[in-house]
């Protein structure tokens, strides 16, 4: 505690008292405000904590250059480790401690694959955060900065890491099932106007994506236009047919190993840091 007073100190919130004076709060009621404490940056989730984490991430980017890959890893409540340990008539949302523990172990394994087994190449630096969705499922946002020789610089490099097409069910049946279950966006649009992504009649995630015969880097920055061939291959999702223009970018190895929603994107700017 003695060595971390800058992070742990509290101070009187005089600004609040000044605000009350401006708002003409009666003097006899102002004393009830008493002393206010500013939560320290060590208190996770507070504005000071989020600002500090953002500044730390930007410091890493300044030293090691912009991120190369942005990965979103979401917990799958149907993982056997969760389902097999649920008591009778209990669902995963009733056991957040079980879900969180399993997800944390999977996340540690994923980070070992990335940083020790070098599935994307050798990593120069990385940063990640873990968040909880409204329905209680944890997910992690991971930024990777690769060593220079492993950075995806041309379309062929991107195609080796990322797919945005429905696999062939005859030759890659297991991968096909995982993609259809976890990596299809929708149904949305006219197929499902009440989808959560729909605002003013338009998908906020910009689906459907345009078909492309080859991957192209965009001069304006952001994510590349991935290869999405219009080969007619379809997947049935909630009784609706979806095509390659509705596939969320993924890495086949990670999907086969972790059987979860794992969105893998190539970064072109530092804007992805704001998602942390």
Predicted ranges, named:
Residues 1-275:
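Extended, structured polyanion-binding interfaces
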């Amino acid at each position: 505690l003695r060595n971390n007073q800058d992070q742990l100190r509290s101070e009187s919130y005089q600004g609040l008292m000044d605000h009350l004076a401006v708002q003409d709060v009666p003097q006899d009621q102002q004393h009830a405000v008493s002393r206010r404490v500013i939560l320290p940056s060590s208190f996770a989730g507070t504005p000071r904590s989020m600002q500090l984490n953002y500044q730390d991430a930007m410091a890493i980017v300044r030293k090691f250059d912009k991120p190369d890959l942005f990965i979103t890893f979401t917990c799958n409540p149907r993982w056997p480790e969760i389902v097999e340990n649920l008591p009778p008539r209990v669902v995963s949302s009733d056991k957040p401690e079980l879900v969180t523990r399993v997800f944390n172990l999977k996340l540690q394994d994923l980070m070992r694959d990335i940083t020790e087994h070098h599935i994307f190449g050798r990593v120069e630096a990385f940063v990640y955060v873990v968040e909880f969705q409204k329905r209680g499922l944890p997910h992690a946002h991971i930024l990777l900065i690769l060593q220079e020789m492993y950075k995806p610089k041309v379309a062929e490099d991107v195609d080796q890491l990322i797919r945005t097409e429905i696999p062939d069910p005859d030759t890659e049946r297991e991968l096909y099932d995982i993609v259809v279950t976890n990596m299809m966006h929708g149904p949305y649009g006219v197929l499902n106007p009440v989808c959560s992504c729909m605002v003013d009649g338009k998908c906020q995630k910009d689906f459907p994506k345009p078909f492309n015969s080859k991957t192209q880097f965009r001069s304006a920055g952001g994510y590349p236009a991935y290869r999405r061939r219009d080969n007619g291959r379809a997947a049935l999702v909630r009784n609706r047919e979806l095509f390659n223009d509705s596939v969320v970018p993924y890495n086949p190895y990670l999907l086969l190993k972790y059987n979860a929603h794992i969105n893998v994107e190539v970064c072109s700017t530092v804007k992805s840091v704001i998602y942390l």
